[in-house]
């Protein structure tokens, strides 16, 4: 395990070091001086800064952060400084900005709940280039609230959940039945294939076929550029990703124009485009809608399939939890079969232990390790000053693995959620506040449906696989399991 991790981290770290040095040198010096100058000459303000260090000249502490991020324990960067400074809130210098890092649940909650009068989103330049200025991840104020509210309400609607449930069942049943006994099923690959097509249908109304396959290929070309070198010259990774986005945008904007041309308001809306064009606001342009449809496809390629895959991995390593989840799902299937009824989305979400498994997977897996915000004014919280222009890194992972908040935090223990309070800010896998992930209910539903069909269809033996944590969480081999079909009376 150690040698495999080292084999992955060494070349990746070398590349990261070169990239950071080449791209950030001049900008880092400028920002560093600006950040370090905050509160200059003001001893009282300086005293209120969190403890910490800006690290090395030019690169700050970025190289050590990246090195830890590629390791099996990314939180080591934060844990080391918590012990050194005696505080879960400390200052650092990461990716070109003076940064306050918080692994304190109360401070993290404060930042997440704050609006654009205190903090605005901050992302790497390559990501902002690809997302576009009208992305829900980047816009602020009333427009952000409107788009988030419209999309969030649609994602919570019974209509979409019913459609998604039927689509998942229709795609999963033949997909799983195609695996003969003793064959190898790669959970991550299957989950991506199923979830992407279903979510795209819910977003833009596109059905399976040639255009769906082209969109999938272009999206895969697009997504690999999100954490790339921010250079747009022909042939570079970012350039190729931008070209892929243009092709996707042309397809989506054609769909938008067709919908606008024939539109009498669909009731209920069939997809997210229907919802946004039905609002009637001049601010919701075709470009804004297409940008956000592409952004909302990211969970289908990344976070939801990884949630499913990690759940299978953790269950495979915890036979007692797997057995209880199997029993719960088999009982539901038998009960609905005896009643002559098809499972509805409410049935899947009623499976309490399955929901505990998903919650624990989100806590332990930390698919989203944290988020960054930038202070637009001086902000003070719990006696710590966050100067205007500084970034704040809200590190979910350290909070989720804090042994003062969770007993045996590195142990997969779904039973802890029978009594655990999730309202105190110590559990934030989907972010929070006005930027809370609008698709959190759909992510849980998709994972519940996938797990139900998997555990009621197969027994399996998992092959060894390892979690890669950076730049995104994934399983190195795609989580291969060797499956055996269950008999109907099992």
UniProtKB/Swiss-Prot annotation:
Superkingdom as given in the UniProt entry: Eukaryota
Pathway of action: Plant hormone biosynthesis; brassinosteroid biosynthesis
Subcellular location: Membrane
Example of a GO biological process term: brassinosteroid homeostasis
Induction: Down-regulated by brassinolide (BL) in ebisu dwarf (d2) mutant.
Function of the molecule: Catalyzes the C6-oxidation step in brassinosteroids biosynthesis. May convert 6-deoxoteasterone (6-deoxoTE) to 3-dehydro-6-deoxoteasterone (6-deoxo3DT, 6-deoxo3DHT), and teasterone (TE) to 3-dehydroteasterone (3DT, 3-DHT). Involved in the elongation of leaf sheaths and stems.
Protein name: Cytochrome P450 90D2
Organism: Oryza sativa subsp. japonica
Gene it is expressed from: CYP90D2
